[in-house]
Amino acid sequence: MGARASVLSGGKLDAWEKIRLRPGGRKKYRLKHLVWASRELERFALNPDLLETADGCQQILGQLQPALKTGTEDLQSLYNTIAVLYCVHQRIDVKDTKEALGKIEEIQNKNKQRTQQAPAAADKEKDSKISQNYPIVQNAQGQMVHQAISPRTLNAWVKVVEEKAFSPEVIPMFSALSEGATPQDLNAMLNTVGGHQAAMQMLKDTINEEAAEWDRLHPVHAGPIPPGQMREPRGSDIAGTTSTLQEQVAWMTGNPPIPVGDIYKRWIILGLNKIVRMYSPVSILDIKQGPKEPFRDYVDRFFRVLRAEQATQDVKNWMTDTLLVQNANPDCRTILKALGRGASIEEMMTACQGVGGPSHKARVLAEAMSQVTNASAAIMMQKGNFKGPRRTVKCSNCGKEGHIARNCRAPRKKGCWKCGQEGHQMKDCTGRQANFLGKIWPSSKGRPGNFPQKRLEPTAPPAESFGFGEEITPSPRQELKEQEPPLTSLRSLFGNDQ
């Protein structure tokens, strides 16, 4: 409490404790009111240290006053307390809160009057001085005279042309540097351009065309010119080739004035637009965002080319709403379409911020892998559905289903599992088995049963021969074919190949 109550001390504290809360009341301000005010300021997110000075109290009053009409009684009490504290800091003698509020209102009214009188005094002082803002200025005698364009302005214009090389931003720069200039000043700016003579020749052709159009729309009136009246400017006069500087100043400052400088400036800007279009051959339709290009760089390129487009503002707005989204890369296009057609440039750049960066690439890769995983799982589930019912296994040892012989708990079957006889295993079983042709396999003759037979199979065992050196002459192949045709089963398999 001591730190909060240290706002006032000495004579100020005595003056504080003499002020009454209400007119004619008994209660007066105490230190507890300062402690309460400090806590309330903290609750309203205001710095309690501002109570230590008169300027701080004035700042707090300025913050609280707009909310008095809709505020609570606590806010009104806080405002009254700080108003009394301000009077104590300023050593303004007040007896109660109401008188302190009246003093505050008087001070605020005086400040408003000073604020209103300051612009009027500034305007009066400005009018008393001679205008030096434009090439045509007013001298001390009240006459309008021409002030030559400064070398600094010419140097700035030359640097812009050399650095930008007739990019779209050259036009607004020329318009700013030539504000209020006469045709003679504009010609001086054009003559300082050393290079780009092809562009300068295009500009001259445009000026000549506009001058001829001016002469066609503003024919010369027949008859002599009345005394005291100036002649009407021709197209060549506006271009500064057949008019003097005095005539140009007189036209621009006459009553009614003829703004020959603004007309000539408009012709030059028209020619500069053609030059900019020639130096910027890229169409707005060709501006597309690269796959890894940040959206901010793409927007910069888009609007740089859009400035060079010779179209109305409505058409440019349509290009911005349509082409900017259409020519973005797929990632940004998806985000921009989700925003809708009414999104501003700020919302677009905020939404596409970070697209193409490492974090965005990682997120896209994770989403793609998740989709592939889900698709693979779905395919596996679909394939599993076509396998039909699961086949049950059967044990070859006990003959029961649900397990195999390796896991069978029944005692091992003795003997051969093929023929059932004991004394040998299935791999050593000599039991014969018929093949798909009905022949016994394995064959005792050493040849498989489906092998084409080249000789007659004997139907009886051969007679015993005790002779030595006897040769058995095989019968000719043709005779074998005539005696016994190929097996029916082989013919059915191989056709006429045998």
From Swiss-Prot:
A motif (Nuclear localization signal) lies at residues 26-32. It comes from the Viruses. Residues 191-229 are annotated as: Interaction with host PPIA/CYPA and NUP153. SUPFAM superfamilies: Retroviral matrix proteins, Retrovirus capsid dimerization domain-like, Retrovirus capsid protein, N-terminal core domain, Retrovirus zinc finger-like domains. The record marks 134-135, 365-366, 380-381, 435-436, 451-452 as: Cleavage. Coiled coil: none annotated. A lipid is attached at residue 2 (N-myristoyl glycine). Residues 110-129, 442-498 are annotated as: Disordered. A motif (Nuclear export signal) lies at residues 16-22. One of its GO terms (biological process) is viral budding via host ESCRT complex. Keywords: AIDS, Capsid protein, Host cell membrane, Host cytoplasm, Host endosome, Host membrane, Host nucleus, Host-virus interaction, Lipoprotein, Membrane, Metal-binding, Methylation, Myristate, Phosphoprotein, Repeat, RNA-binding, Viral budding, Viral budding via the host ESCRT complexes, Viral nucleoprotein, Viral release from host cell, Virion, Zinc, Zinc-finger. Residues 73-77 are annotated as: Interaction with membrane phosphatidylinositol 4,5-bisphosphate. Residues 14-33 are annotated as: Interaction with membrane phosphatidylinositol 4,5-bisphosphate and RNA. Residues 8-43 are annotated as: Interaction with host CALM1. Gag-Pol polyprotein: Specific enzymatic cleavages by the viral protease yield mature proteins. The keyword Membrane applies. Residues 7-31 are annotated as: Interaction with Gp41. GO terms for cellular component: host cell nucleus; host cell plasma membrane; host multivesicular body; membrane; viral nucleocapsid; virion membrane. Residues 279-365 are annotated as: Dimerization/Multimerization of capsid protein p24. Belongs to the primate lentivirus group gag polyprotein family. This is Gag polyprotein. It comes from Human immunodeficiency virus type 1 group M subtype H (isolate VI991) (HIV-1). The gene is gag.
